[in-house]
């Protein structure tokens, strides 16, 4: 029971934080705080999910009602982990974070935080709209440590 009390929030991840993806280690590093996998789900609201920039970053675009019901994973996280995820996502300067309803595999709905981008060039909407993100050899994700241009400055790429 004590562990549940320490958990602060539920977070829906749809990109590089999912299991098997390049940034999943953020959720498993003890020094980042606690994260417990709750299951798979999808957004109740449709959103455009695209891969953009020369670094092949998945972006959930703040255009509710457009795109697809996005598939992802739900984690329960503590305050420390939530603050580390905010750093990774450069919230609130780059990504925004908002509550959305997620339909879990067991058909229950829960409220979760998710990260999305509000300021983007319109041409991002012309990219392939995904249902689920996967890092691929054709579009390999590049971590922050190897980037020469900030992702924010590269949105028009």
From Swiss-Prot:
Keyword Acyltransferase: yes
Binding site for substrate: 14-17
Enzyme Commission number(s): 2.3.2.-
Top-level taxonomic group: Eukaryota
Active site, renumbered: 89
Keywords from the named record: Acyltransferase, Transferase
CDD domains in the cross-refs: GGCT_like (cd06661)
GO CC annotations, alphabetized: cytosol
Enzymatic class: transferase
GO MF assignments: acyltransferase activity; gamma-glutamylaminecyclotransferase activity
Keyword hit for Transferase: yes
Record-stated family: Belongs to the gamma-glutamylcyclotransferase family.
Function: Putative gamma-glutamylcyclotransferase.
Name of the protein: Putative gamma-glutamylcyclotransferase CG2811
Species of provenance: Drosophila melanogaster (Fruit fly)
Organismal lineage: Eukaryota, Metazoa, Ecdysozoa, Arthropoda, Hexapoda
């Amino acid at each position: 029971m004590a562990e549940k009390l320490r958990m602060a929030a539920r977070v829906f991840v749809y990109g590089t934080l999912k299991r098997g993806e390049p940034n999943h280690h953020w959720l498993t590093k003890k020094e980042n705080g606690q994260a417990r996998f709750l299951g798979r789900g999808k957004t109740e609201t449709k959103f455009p999910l695209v891969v953009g920039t020369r670094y092949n970053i998945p972006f959930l675009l703040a255009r509710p009602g457009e795109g697809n019901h996005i598939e992802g994973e739900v984690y329960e996280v503590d305050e420390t982990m939530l603050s580390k995820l905010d750093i990774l996502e450069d919230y609130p300067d780059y990504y925004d974070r908002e509550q959305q309803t997620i339909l879990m595999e067991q058909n229950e709905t829960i409220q979760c935080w998710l990260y999305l981008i509000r300021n983007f060039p319109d041409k991002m909407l012309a990219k392939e709209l995904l249902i689920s993100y996967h890092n691929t050899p054709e579009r390999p994700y590049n971590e922050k440590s190897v980037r020469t241009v900030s992702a924010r400055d590269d949105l028009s790429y």
